[in-house]
Amino acid sequence: MAKKSSVEKNKHRAQLVKQYAGRRARLKAIANDETLSMEERFEARLKLAELPRNSAPVRLRNRCEISGRPRAFTRKMKMSRIAVRELGSQGLIPGLVKSSW
């Protein structure tokens, strides 16, 4: 199990990313638009820098929904490999069959 504080921190970051997504996208579009003047683009960059750091999607970490484990994360199931194995062996994941060859 991951520390509760790190899981909660990541949840807070996810909330901030969602909250500032529109504003961040607009400012990035202005900053990257080469038809605008350099002053306008620079102003957009400054406003972008004023946004909270944790509102950047880069700062999010994919974590297991069950254990909070940050590594060995499968995007399709939003779980770590360990949780997938445990739930799969119990038959709790529909369509998941143990492989044998």
Swiss-Prot record:
Biological process according to GO: translation
Molecular function (Gene Ontology), one example: structural constituent of ribosome
Family annotation (Gene3D superfamilies): 1.10.287.1480
Pfam families (alphabetical): Ribosomal_S14 (PF00253)
UniProt key word Glycoprotein: no
Keyword Electron transport annotated: no
Assembly and interaction partners: Part of the 30S ribosomal subunit. Contacts proteins S3 and S10.
Protein name: Small ribosomal subunit protein uS14
Species whose genome carries this gene: Beijerinckia indica subsp. indica (strain ATCC 9039 / DSM 1715 / NCIMB 8712)
Gene it is expressed from: rpsN
